[in-house]
Each structure stands twice: as C-alpha cells, then as structure tokens.
C-alpha cells in the first residue's frame, strides 16, 4: 500500500509535481502525467483560455489531476492576488502557487511580496504554495500566515543546475513543520532523489522533463527517482564515517598453524 502524502486538504500517493510549460505540444501532457505517476500539475493562468478553445491547456489535463495554477507574471503581491482570484473564478480550484518575480535576469522570487500575497489569500480560503528563495525566517513567516507548504528553489528557474541550495533547503526541512517542496532548477532524476533523501516532502519539475530528448521517458525516470528517494529517507540511511569500516570479518578466517 502506497504512503499517503497529505497536503493542502488533499491526499496524494505521488510526491512528484509536474509543470506544464515548454512542451513542444500540449498533447504530451497526458502521457507525461501517466508516465510520472504525478497527480498534480501546475500551469500559468495566461495559458488557460476561458473560452475553452482547442488550445486551452485544461483540455489536455485529466479530470482526476489536481490543478495548481501559478501566478507567473506577477511582479508584486497585488498582481499575484488578482491572478489567484481569476484562477478560482475560472474553475481551477483553491490551490495556487504564488510566484512573485520582479528580477528579470535571474527570476528570483520576491520573498516579502510573496508573504504579503500568501497572508491575503489564505484568509480567503486558498491553499497557498509559495515559491521562495530558501530563507528560514521567511519560511517561518509563511508558516505563520497559513501557507500549505513552502516551495524553495533548488537553483534558478529553468537552469537545470540541480540542488545548488541544498544546505539552506536542509535547514528548512529541519526547522519548520510545513511540507518542503523543492521547486525550480532540478535537472536530473538523481537530484530529485537527493532532495527526497534529505527529507523534502515532494519535488516539482518542469524544464528537466520538457527539454529532454524523450520527455515521457524522463517523466517516468523522475517518478521512479522521487519514489526511490522517499523510500531511502524512510529507511534511514546509515551514518557516514571518516574511516573505513569493514563489512566482513578481517580476522579468524585463516587459522595460523
């Protein structure tokens, strides 16, 4: 029986979240979700056509998949709040990933505007998942204002550079009670497994899958990696040692005459 991941008022059996951007065609989305086992998909509200034309991304997302609209494009809290409300009005539910980015070079999140948006939206009944630069005091404040989880970046968005912030993420995992979902920059399944082995609650990937030579196969690889990393974390990896420790006896095998 699979372990249940309870977050945002829902119970999931997969700890891999999938992004919906950068695919060569939206028609890949059902196969990506099926191969990865993911039950949650994020999408930018600007890609949701409320007229429900053929290009509406919602046409390609299975009905049993949890929607996590994001506020991509928001430059401050007010814009993020407006996008979240539009998503709810469009029938996308109460989950929302807050992205507030005013830095156009590195696309780093504005933690302080993110806190402001989170506080307003949680008061309105949203399940808020804030994308953030990993900072313990910011994470604690997001917890205080009611975030459902925190989503620290592993590396800049779309960089595929891996878990560059591992020590800062590790601190969040150890010090706050909210689920920590590593988001952005994860480029290889091995990096997703590492995040899960550290104790992350889940991982969100997009670019690593969308830009792979075979996106469906890569989605499957990420699903397996996240599951393996979680299993390893629960198994309790052995302590590291500074010196060698033999796994077999070194004495008593050959008797001296």
Swiss-Prot record:
This entry's Gene Ontology molecular function terms read:
thiazole synthase activity
Q: What class does this enzyme belong to in the EC scheme?
A: transferase
Tell me, which GO biological process terms does this entry list?
thiamine diphosphate biosynthetic process
Keywords, ordered alphabetically = Cytoplasm, Schiff base, Thiamine biosynthesis, Transferase
Q: Major place of localization?
A: cytoplasm
EC code: 2.8.1.10
Q: Which domain of life is it from?
A: Bacteria
> Where does the chain bind 1-deoxy-D-xylulose 5-phosphate?
158, 184-185, 206-207
Q: What Gene3D superfamilies does its record include?
A: Aldolase class I (3.20.20.70)
Metabolic or biological pathway: Cofactor biosynthesis; thiamine diphosphate biosynthesis
State any GO CC term.
Answer: cytoplasm
For this protein, the record's InterPro entries field holds: Aldolase_TIM, Thiazole_synthase_ThiG, ThiG
Q: Where in the cell is it found?
A: Cytoplasm
Query: What does the record give as the reaction this protein catalyses?
Result: [ThiS sulfur-carrier protein]-C-terminal-Gly-aminoethanethioate + 2-iminoacetate + 1-deoxy-D-xylulose 5-phosphate = [ThiS sulfur-carrier protein]-C-terminal Gly-Gly + 2-[(2R,5Z)-2-carboxy-4-methylthiazol-5(2H)-ylidene]ethyl phosphate + 2 H2O + H(+)
Residues forming the catalytic site: 97 (schiff-base intermediate with dxp)
Per the entry, what this protein does is: Catalyzes the rearrangement of 1-deoxy-D-xylulose 5-phosphate (DXP) to produce the thiazole phosphate moiety of thiamine. Sulfur is provided by the thiocarboxylate moiety of the carrier protein ThiS. In vitro, sulfur can be provided by H(2)S.
- Description of how the protein assembles with itself and partners: Homotetramer. Forms heterodimers with either ThiH or ThiS.
Which family does the record claim for this protein?
A: Belongs to the ThiG family.
**Name the UniProt record assigns to this protein:** Thiazole synthase
The species this protein was found in: Desulforamulus reducens (strain ATCC BAA-1160 / DSM 100696 / MI-1)
């Amino acid at each position: 029986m699979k372990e249940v991941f309870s977050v945002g008022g829902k119970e999931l059996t997969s700890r891999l979240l999938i992004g919906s951007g950068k695919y060569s065609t939206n028609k890949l989305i059902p196969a990506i979700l099926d191969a990865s086992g993911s039950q949650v998909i994020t999408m930018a509200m600007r890609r949701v056509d409320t007229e429900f034309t053929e290009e509406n991304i919602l046409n390609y997302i299975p009905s049993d998949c949890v929607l996590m609209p994001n506020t991509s494009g928001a430059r401050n809290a007010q814009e993020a709040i407006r996008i979240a409300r539009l998503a709810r009005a469009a029938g996308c539910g109460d989950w929302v990933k807050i992205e507030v980015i005013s830095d156009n070079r590195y696309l780093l999140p504005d933690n302080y505007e993110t806190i402001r948006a989170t506080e307003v939206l949680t008061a309105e009944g949203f399940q808020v998942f804030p994308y953030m630069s990993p900072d313990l005091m910011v994470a604690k404040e997001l917890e205080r204002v009611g975030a459902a989880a925190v989503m620290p970046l592993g590396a800049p968005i779309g960089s595929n550079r891996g878990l560059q912030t591992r020590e800062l993420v590790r601190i969040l995992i150890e010090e706050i009670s909210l689920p920590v979902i590593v988001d952005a920059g994860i480029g290889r399944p091995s990096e997703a497994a590492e995040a899960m082995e550290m104790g992350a609650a889940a991982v969100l990937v997009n670019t690593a899958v969308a830009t792979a030579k075979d996106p469906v196969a890569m989605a499957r690889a990420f699903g397996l990696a996240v599951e393996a990393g979680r299993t390893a974390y629960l198994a309790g990896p052995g302590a590291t040692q500074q010196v060698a420790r033999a796994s077999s006896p070194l004495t008593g095998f050959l008797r001296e005459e």
